[in-house]
Amino acid sequence: MHCLVTSTSIKLTAPSDTIDVQYCSDYFEKNNKQKPKINLPKLPVGLAELRALVKGGFKANDLKLQHVLAYLGHLLQDIKGELTEDWTSFGVLIGNRSHNITPLDLLDVNYYDDKLLDGVKANDASQSDDAWMLFACLGIYRLARTQNLQHRSSILMKMNAQILSLNQNAIKLVDNTMFYNSWISNYNYTKLIAACDMFFYKFKDHEHAVCRFGTIPSRWKDCGGLTSLSHLKNLTGMELEEIVSWVFVPSIGKEICRMMKSGQELDKPDSYVPYMMDLGLSMKSPYSSSANGGTYTWIHMIGSIMHSQRSLHARMVNENELPNIRISAMLTAYVKFNKGSLMKVFVKEEDKHLYIGEDQDENEGNGSDYIDLTQHPNTDSADDWYQWLEINNFTLDDIIKDSITRECKKIQNTRAGTIGSYIQTTLS
């Protein structure tokens, strides 16, 4: 650019501190397809004494993470599942068909000698305590990740109910933010959590699968952009191909292309990829809400207008291109809220010949051959509506605006800093 005042030419630049996203596949390529590494303390005591220290820690509300890691390192060796097929992910062989594996087999475990920290021992600890203490030790992860005090209290109440169902003589868990909140910053603890959830997701009928109550937030952690696509798919009934056809904002298109990079096992349920963050496979998720702020905001604006509670509570993480994203979201929500895609599903047996061979979807969801661009399209086709929007200079008419306003006025009690609050205050 040239400045007329100073008669100089300048190059316009803006500061940037963004970190490139890291894909799961890159980790395994750089590490010769080795399992994620974890370091666990090797203490000069056996399982019985560790069990006593963990139970004593629960009693005294002074549980040491070192004791928990060593205890889980022992206990998880006896939690096994038999594979019905070879289990591989990113070229890593996790286990062979018909073999028994444990959660630790998902990791490359390094045991290191460590000095035993002092702790309170419970003299009445026994093997019967293992089930509830395993649940509690893993459940602390979910508790620690919950910052909202009301929700945290609810989680704790549910945890204690489950603990008592596992053992009526179990010790009720007491929240200790000073200790527990620091646990989720310990890479070895979070790697154990991820390995356990990945194992119990694979073996859904395992007797200890109930432990997923505490570990489930590890699955798809920091993948809010990607999981929001699934949310919109479920909310609207649209397939992903149709969803992306409604993307009219170029920056959102770039985000979706980046998320859909091939070779990442996104469609493989038992892959390492849902646990990439807690397993330390990526420093910055390519699927997070912050890395895909436009997509995340667009989807949850649509969801908020359609009164989805999940969308209403979604955090407002993006302020870039808000005018374009808002217009695009309003149009998509209007069409999908007011135009259904219905078909005849059941008929009487004697009438089925009237329907067999009939192409019921002949005109459903497809662009029409001709539309009057001065009127709203009579289809729910993204192509038709984009043509209408383009011919109207990308401006929504009063019919659409009034319809959206009526819906947004029904929204109540949103939390500050959420997309629901933004929709309520700007569109109602």
UniProtKB/Swiss-Prot annotation:
Keywords: Capsid protein, Helical capsid protein, Host cytoplasm, Ribonucleoprotein, RNA-binding, Viral nucleoprotein, Viral RNA replication, Virion. SUPFAM superfamilies: Rhabdovirus nucleoprotein-like. One of its GO terms (molecular function) is RNA binding. Its main location: virion. It is found in: Virion; Host cytoplasm. InterPro entries: Rhabdo_ncapsid (IPR000448), Rhabdovirus_ncapsid_C (IPR023331), Rhabdovirus_ncapsid_N (IPR023330), Rhabdovirus_nucleoprotein-like (IPR035961). Homomultimerizes to form the nucleocapsid. Binds to viral genomic RNA. N in nucleocapsid binds the P protein and thereby positions the polymerase on the template. Interaction of N(0) with the P protein prevents the uncontrolled aggregation of N(0). This is Nucleoprotein. The lineage of its organism: Viruses, Riboviria, Orthornavirae, Negarnaviricota, Haploviricotina. The gene is N.
